[in-house]
Structure formats: structure tokens, C-alpha cells
């Protein structure tokens, strides 16, 4: 009888332990703008950022901000996980369409409401969607480099798309800097590589005011360089000069 009671107690403990993540997800969903499925997907990401990558957050995205474009250096496939640490609100992000082509990945990206875009040329449909959603109050993360930086450079050449989107949506740009990500362009590598990552969040930049509402090439380049230098300042770098990407930026990167 005592042995049966012990087994029953163990079974109850195991069931409760198995249900704990579910109860946590339900509780967080009630308090969060994320829906239940998004919470279930983000919970493992939160575990990775807290324990495997021992992440530290310096600054947060203002809770009362009505839409913004987040920009950051881009070192790993896990970068969006760190960006989400900075806000209770769901942060959307853009990824290259080829990385969401598989049926399972495509379904997961739909749940997370990720925006897919082509990397060659201008993806008009994706750009219009980002402008529309940022204008409606959503936080969107865009990486000006447009590809992973696996070089020794602070940042590679950048494009002005994120700044153009922010100006047309009438929202600020929030610069962020990810520090100490020792990862490569192997997508899975971050998930088995311990690290001590820090995310620095800067002050919102009124790019509409800086650009006087204009999106001509010269204005976009000037405002983009200003925003990129703010990322460098978060890294403690004050003498870095950003490089703007040319038309063949992707070809140059892969050659």
C-alpha cells in the first residue's frame, strides 16, 4: 500500500511538472499581447536566451511607443530572440524568403507573423506590409546589413530600406546593438553554442524630422548613416564610418 501511494505521488508530481509549462504559457498569454501559440514558441527562445546565452539587457523599448522600426547589427540566426527580450509586445521581423520555404518553417513563421522578403532587388509587397504594420503601431525589427556578418568588421555595408520604411510609416527608429555573439553563418550553431550576450537599446530617433519627411537617395543615405552611428555609439565606438551598399551588394558578399 505504501509503495502504491509512493508511485501515485510520483505520478502526480510528474504530471504537474509536465503541465507547468502549459500553465505558465496560459498565464503569460493572459498578461501579454502575444497569443497562446506565439507564447509556446517564444518560451523555448526565452530559455535559450536566459541559460545557454546568459543574456543581459541594457535598456528597454518604451512600452508606450506607437510603432517603431528596430535596427541592429546582425551576427546570428538567433538575433530576433535577443531583440524580443527588450519588449513585452511582440516584435515582428523580416527574413529572407528562402529561409522560410520549408512547410514546417513556413507554418511556424506564419504563427509568429514574420514578414518574408526577397533579398534581390526591392520586394514591394513586403515593404508595403512593413510600412502598413509599423504605421498601425507594430514594432518591426530590420537588419540594415541584410545578411549575417561573419567578418571581423563592426558592421558590413548597409542599405537604407529600414530608414525609408520608418519615414514613410511616420515612426521612429530604435537603434540596438548585440554584443558578444560568437556565431557563424551556420543557422543551427547558436543553439548549441554557449555565450554571454548583451543587448543594448538606444533612444528612439525621429527620422521623419531628420529627413523632413523626404525619402530621396541623398536624404536616406544621410539619415541612415546617422542611425548606424548610433548603433556604433551603443558599442562604445565613436570613430566608425558606415559604408552604404551598392546595387550589387549581395553579389559582392557571396563572391
Model-found features: residue ranges?
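Short, flexible loop segments at the rims of nucleotide/cofactor-binding pockets, characterized by
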Residues: 46-53, 70-71, 116-120, 151-153
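N-terminal signal-anchor transmembrane helix
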Residues: 28-67, 107
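Catalytic core of membrane glycerolipid acyltransferases/transacylases, capturing the structured
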Residues: 63-121
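Non-catalytic C-terminal accessory region of glycerolipid acyltransferases
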Residues: 2-15, 125-255
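Glycine-rich, highly charged phosphate/nucleotide-binding loops
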Residues: 54-56, 121-126
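A generic structural signal for well-ordered alpha-helical segments
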Residues: 48, 86, 109, 133, ...
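Hydrophobic core of alpha-helical transmembrane segments in multi-pass integral membrane proteins
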Residues: 13-26
Amino acid at each position: 500500500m505504501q509503495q502504491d501511494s509512493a508511485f501515485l505521488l510520483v505520478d502526480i508530481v510528474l504530471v504537474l511538472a509536465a503541465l507547468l509549462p502549459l500553465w505558465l504559457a496560459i498565464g503569460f498569454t493572459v498578461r501579454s499581447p502575444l497569443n497562446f501559440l506565439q507564447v509556446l514558441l517564444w518560451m523555448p527562445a526565452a530559455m535559450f536566451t536566459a541559460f545557454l546565452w546568459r543574456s543581459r539587457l541594457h535598456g528597454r523599448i518604451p512600452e508606450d511607443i506607437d510603432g517603431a522600426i528596430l535596427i541592429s547589427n546582425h551576427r546570428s540566426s538567433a538575433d530576433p530572440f535577443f531583440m524580443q527580450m527588450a519588449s513585452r509586445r511582440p516584435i515582428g521581423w523580416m527574413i529572407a524568403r528562402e529561409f522560410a520555404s520549408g512547410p514546417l518553417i513556413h507554418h511556424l513563421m506564419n504563427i509568429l507573423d514574420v514578414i518574408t522578403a526577397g533579398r534581390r532587388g526591392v520586394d514591394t509587397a513586403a515593404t508595403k506590409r512593413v510600412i502598413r504594420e509599423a504605421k498601425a503601431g507594430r514594432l518591426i525589427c530590420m537588419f540594415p546589413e541584410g545578411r549575417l556578418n561573419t567578418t571581423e568588421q563592426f558592421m558590413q555595408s548597409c542599405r537604407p530600406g529600414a530608414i525609408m520604411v520608418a519615414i514613410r510609416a511616420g515612426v521612429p527608429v530604435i537603434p540596438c546593438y548585440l554584443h558578444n555573439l560568437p556565431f557563424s553563418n551556420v543557422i543551427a550553431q547558436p543553439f548549441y553554442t554557449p555565450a554571454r550576450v548583451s543587448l543594448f537599446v538606444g533612444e528612439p530617433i525621429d527620422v521623419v524630422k531628420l529627413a523632413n519627411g523626404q525619402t530621396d537617395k541623398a536624404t536616406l543615405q544621410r539619415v541612415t548613416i546617422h542611425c548606424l552611428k548610433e548603433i556604433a555609439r551603443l558599442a562604445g565606438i565613436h570613430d566608425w564610418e558606415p559604408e552604404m551598399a551598392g546595387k550589387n551588394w549581395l553579389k559582392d558578399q557571396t563572391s
